[in-house]
Each structure stands twice: as C-alpha cells, then as structure tokens.
Amino acid sequence: MENLSKLESIVELYFSKKYKLYKPQDANGEDLGKWFEFESRAHFLDAYLNYYRNLPNLKSAIVNGCSAKFKILYESQEYELKHNHQEEFKDEKGNLRGVNNSVLSSMAVKLTFKTTQLEAAESFDDVYRIVKSAKVSGFGELSIYDAAIRISVFLGFKPTKVFLHAGTRVGAKYLEDKGLLPEDSSQEDTLELSDFPEPTQKLDAMQLENFLCSFKNDLIKI
C-alpha cells in the first residue's frame, strides 16, 4: 500500500509540477538561449503535439514528424523548436550524441514514399509499423515511436498500448523491482494499460509512456 501511495503522488506531479525547458538554439540552429515554462509535463506534451494535430496535410506531418520540428506560441510569440529527443548535442566528454539532421531528412524522404500506406492506416499500430518499415540507419526506436506519435496525432490516432524503449523501459523496470509490474514485463516491447497499477490508470497510453521516462528518477525512490 505504501508503494502505491508513493506512486500516486508521483502521478499527480505529472499533472501539477511545472516543467521547464531550456533551448540554446531554435529548430534551425539559430541562437535562442531561452527558458520555456509549462504548467506540467502533461501540458507540454499536449502543447507540443497540438502543432502536428493542426498541420495542413499528411506530407507536412511526415516531414515535421521525422525532423522533430514544431512551433509553439509562448508569451505571445511563436517559436520553432526541435524536440530534445532528436537534437544533436555534445556530451560531457565532447562526443556528439543525438540524431544528425541528415538522418532525419533521409527518414522523412523515405517515409514520404509511404504516404499512400499511411493514408490507409486505421490505428496507431498501423502507423508505427509503417514508420518502422521505413527506418534508416541512425533513426532508432525512440525516434520511430516519436515520429509515429506525431503523424498519428495528425491522423487522429493514439496508442492503446504502452511502448517501451530507452528511458521508458528504465521507468518500467523500477516499477517492476517494486512489485508494481509483473516480473520481466520491462523486457517487453509493449505493455497493456491493465498491466499497470491503479494509480497510473488516470493516464492514457501515450501519457504513461511519457510519464515513465520523465519521472524515472522519482520512480526509483519508491
């Protein structure tokens, strides 16, 4: 019961704790050096995906979905940003990390040839499968999921299962270690919402994926 109570408190933070995002550059590499503050992680997820939801056509959703570029209105000004999952950056040792722009562009070009298939998609799972089939080298599982989410939002689809990858898998492992997820479930590619304990049931599958990664450092403390 104590673990469930702690988890419930962390879930509440997903909707109530302010989220601050620093962007040294905009989506086009121009110096920006600005902090953005959102009401919560849940609010940021909705605000960022709202850009893709309102794009004029599927091709623009594919191109922007792969490039991770999005526009957001903040303090009465519009900014074009790039999602940090696909940003290129130098780590503490000076090594270049992230996804190169040439990889993102190649993925967008390749996926554009599958526009007809995407138009015929009937679910997030369909979109995810199509995006994955167009994978280019350097465009990893997290980028595949992110692109599928962005394109699916435009098409009106949402995942019904929780996809595990990178930090999301780490968050799931912490819940598993506390007996809040079935044994070895963190090794699966996807989990059903019903696999998760009651405190997380107020999250949909997309939010829960986001929560597991964003709050993994809190989950380890349960």
Model-derived features with residue positions:
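Domain-scale selection of a single, long terminal region
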Residues: 1-102, 106
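Generic structural signal for hydrophobic core residues of well-folded globular domains
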Residues: 65, 69-73, 131, 151-152, ...
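C-terminal accessory module of base-excision DNA glycosylases/AP lyases that mediates lesion recognition
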Residues: 1-50, 117-128, 145-222
